[in-house]
Amino acid sequence: MGKVLLATDSYYYSPTANGICVEAIADQLVAMGKEVHVLCFRHKNDLKEEQINGIKVHRIEMDWVNKLRFLYEKELTGMEQSFVKNIMIFLNRLEAVFFIHWFPMRSPIFCARYKRKMEQLQNKYSFDIIVASYSPFEAAYALTYMDERIPVKKCLYTLDSFTNLKKRFFMSREYQERKGWKWERKIYSKCDIILNLKCHEKHYNKTRYDVFRTKMKIVDIPHMKEYDFEENLEKEKTLTIMYAGAIRDDIMPYALTYFEEMMQNDRLVFKLYTRSTVASYRKMINKDANKNFITNGFVDRKTVLVEERKADFLLSMGNANSDFISSKVIELIATGKSIIHIYSYNKDSALPYYDIYPNCCCLNINDSVDINKKKIIEFINSERKTVPFKELEKMYFLNSPKYTAQIISDLEGTF
């Protein structure tokens, strides 16, 4: 039985999108008979170590920026949330200035601590394979700089890209590209295998990556997963559409415009689960529609998954000028339910996934409002069928956790 360590940021109780991907792979590796460990960030009240679903979880104390980020995202509301968020943004940008030469590294001390913990676990458990997700940067750094005398296969799981980025802060795309490429060369040279997401495939087809080509494999967001809940999934009497996640300010007003008349006539309830401020959106619709606009703050992932399966329709918001594919897209498709996808960018990265999904209505906000309203009414009035999971698993086989887990497992036999 092979031993695998997966290194990530926040896992299970307060997961990031990357932590959720790692969880799906970890669960699949356990199902394949592997001994699986996870190294992740420690949140308040978390144990330093515990067993979760057959996986040994080891936690490391976070740096201050991450502590503040998760504090305002998960625990605070109102003025307190805004205050802590502003402090976090200030410290984050201050670190970016201090360590701009080493972008995207922000905290050398945290990197060293993550590396030390990874080495300690390797010396204790003798893993066959270590899989470090990027992000966090600390996991990729630790994988690269851990003691080379340690016999272990190294896998970089690039859930985010070092180089295929949008402009951030005060740095130009060219600067980010140059610094990211420098880190890629360092990290890739130390890895036995590099897993790149399909949404970045075109980027990694550049000739400069030819030297690493034999190490690279294309995978995808591993969210094509079936869930079995014991909770009562009894549906509401009124049709419901549900959205969970960050709100795009350029898309949300259009969504409300499209749904307002049906909400006003009690034909549709719009449920929203988000950390984003929603007060301004209530002012965009009339009083009669507002009663069917149900807003909620942050809730745990299990609640979101249950609510998605109770809803009649799921709302998806597109990406803005980015190759990156949100894990939420695959999560919604995996339900087999009716999806309304609203986007603004003609090359929206989610469209190739929704184009082959037989239960989706895609709306470009640049089209006529009346035409889009008509499309929605026709879609809502049409016969609703849930696409069987077995059918979806075949259509989106790259998105199955089995696909990525098998590539990692195969690495064990290359010693």
Residue map of PLM features:
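Conserved catalytic-core segment of nucleotide-activated headgroup transferases in glycan assembly
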Residues: 224-227, 234-284
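Catalytic binding pocket for nucleotide-activated donors in carbohydrate/polymer assembly enzymes
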Residues: 309-394
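Conserved nucleotide-sugar donor-binding subdomain of glycosyltransferases
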Residues: 78-129, 176, 180
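Short beta-strand->alpha-helix junction loop in the catalytic core
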Residues: 162, 200, 218-228
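A short, active-site helix/loop in glycosyltransferases that binds the activated sugar's phosphate group
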Residues: 186-216
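Active-site proximal beta-strand in glycosyltransferases
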Residues: 4, 129, 145-165
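Membrane-proximal helix-turn-helix segments that form the acceptor-binding/catalytic region
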Residues: 24, 138, 145, 162, ...
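Nucleotide-activated donor-binding/catalytic signature segment of Leloir-type glycosyltransferases, i.e.
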Residues: 280-303
